[in-house]
């Protein structure tokens, strides 16, 4: 049986909010079986809980933002990506601000945080969503789709007419039966164009944005002194984002996802379309009588 997982102990981290520029304290806590991932705004009285669910996504401009009434938590995708990548099913995430800290712009600091807390298996079967039929959402030449697949595979293409991108599309594909999220995906940082960053500053946004937490590109080159961490970092970050956005289904996936020049909005629309099409998916669990999905060994049993 593939079991549910939760952090072994409470652990904290501090960072800066990308848009507020203010210091944020994040606390990761273990949670009982079948809790799911739950964000908590502990700076409010009473504390407001927001489940990590596609139904609570209220804004997808620049990042994925969860809303519960007038309360929000922004930039959840990198942390969710790390939780998904390490197979964490249940956790409480306490924050004292309306956004998750941006850290270095990747999911690697969150992976380190979770690994530092330790991972504990729980006495309940992990739930998966298995894709049974193709589902596709498209708009203005961009698209996202789910396809049936025995394991979990993500393919993404970006395209920018810019010298840094060699004026042509970039594509990567990760099949997680043989790919390590920790080694090959989590270190990819978010990226943006200097011209857009300046416009955001004028709108009182991106106050916490810097070369320390994003790859910044001007009209010709990458401005970060150390350049890229690896050649496919731009498009791999889009895979990282997608993994986080897809985890808002509340379960790990058995299927293939393809994104073409898409972003958080299309990702969320795809989740909503999938849930409506109940003939296109099913919940499944894996025990000794059921076949195991093709997933990387880092998902398999850990020390209790």
From Swiss-Prot:
It catalyses: a UDP-3-O-[(3R)-3-hydroxyacyl]-N-acetyl-alpha-D-glucosamine + H2O = a UDP-3-O-[(3R)-3-hydroxyacyl]-alpha-D-glucosamine + acetate. It comes from the Bacteria. Pathway: Glycolipid biosynthesis; lipid IV(A) biosynthesis; lipid IV(A) from (3R)-3-hydroxytetradecanoyl-[acyl-carrier-protein] and UDP-N-acetyl-alpha-D-glucosamine: step 2/6. One of its GO terms (biological process) is lipid A biosynthetic process. Its cofactor is Zn(2+). Its EC number is 3.5.1.108. Zn(2+) binds at residues 78, 237, 241. InterPro entries: Ribosomal_Su5_D2-typ_SF (IPR020568), UDP-acyl_GlcNac_deAcase (IPR004463), UDP-acyl_GlcNac_deAcase_C (IPR011334), UDP-acyl_N-AcGlcN_deAcase_N (IPR015870). It holds the Pfam family LpxC. GO terms for cellular component: membrane. Gene3D superfamilies: lpxc deacetylase, domain 1 (3.30.230.20), lpxc deacetylase, domain 2 (3.30.1700.10). GO terms for molecular function: metal ion binding; UDP-3-O-acyl-N-acetylglucosamine deacetylase activity. The active site is at residue 264. Keywords: Hydrolase, Lipid A biosynthesis, Lipid biosynthesis, Lipid metabolism, Metal-binding, Zinc. NCBIfam families: lpxC (TIGR00325). PANTHER family: UDP-3-O-ACYL-N-ACETYLGLUCOSAMINE DEACETYLASE 1, MITOCHONDRIAL-RELATED (PTHR33694:SF1). Catalyzes the hydrolysis of UDP-3-O-myristoyl-N-acetylglucosamine to form UDP-3-O-myristoylglucosamine and acetate, the committed step in lipid A biosynthesis. Belongs to the LpxC family. HAMAP family: LpxC. This is UDP-3-O-acyl-N-acetylglucosamine deacetylase. The lineage of its organism: Bacteria, Pseudomonadati, Pseudomonadota, Gammaproteobacteria, Legionellales. The gene is lpxC.
């Amino acid at each position: 049986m593939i079991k549910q997982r939760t952090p072994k102990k409470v652990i904290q981290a501090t960072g800066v909010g990308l848009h507020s520029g203010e210091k944020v304290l994040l606390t990761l806590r273990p949670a009982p079986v079948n809790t799911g991932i739950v964000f908590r705004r502990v700076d409010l009285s009473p504390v407001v809980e927001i489940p990590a669910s596609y139904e609570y996504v209220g804004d997808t401009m620049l990042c994925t933002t969860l809303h519960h009434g007038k309360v929000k938590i922004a930039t959840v995708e990198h942390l969710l990506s790390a939780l998904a990548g390490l197979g964490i099913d249940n956790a409480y995430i306490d924050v004292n601000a309306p956004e998750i800290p941006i850290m270095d712009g990747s999911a690697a600091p969150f992976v380190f945080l979770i690994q530092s807390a330790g991972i504990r298996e729980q006495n309940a079967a992990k739930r998966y969503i298995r894709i049974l039929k193709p589902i596709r959402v498209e708009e203005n030449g961009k698209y996202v789709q789910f396809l049936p697949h025995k394991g979990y595979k993500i393919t993404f293409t970006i395209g920018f007419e810019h010298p840094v991108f060699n004026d042509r599309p970039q594509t990567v594909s990760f099949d997680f039966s043989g790919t390590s999220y920790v080694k090959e995906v989590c270190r990819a940082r978010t990226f943006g164009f200097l011209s857009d960053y300046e416009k955001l500053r004028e709108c009182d946004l991106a106050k916490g944005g810097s070369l320390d937490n994003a790859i910044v590109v001007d009209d010709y080159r990458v401005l970060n002194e150390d350049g890229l961490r690896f050649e496919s970092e731009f498009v791999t970050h889009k895979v990282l984002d997608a993994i986080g956005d897809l985890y808002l289904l509340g379960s790990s996936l058995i299927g293939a996802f393809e994104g073409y020049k898409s972003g958080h909005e299309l990702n969320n629309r795809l989740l909503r379309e999938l849930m409506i099409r109940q003939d296109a998916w099913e919940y499944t669990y894996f025990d000794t009588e059921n076949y195991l999905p093709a997933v990387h060994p880092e998902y398999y049993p850990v020390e209790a």
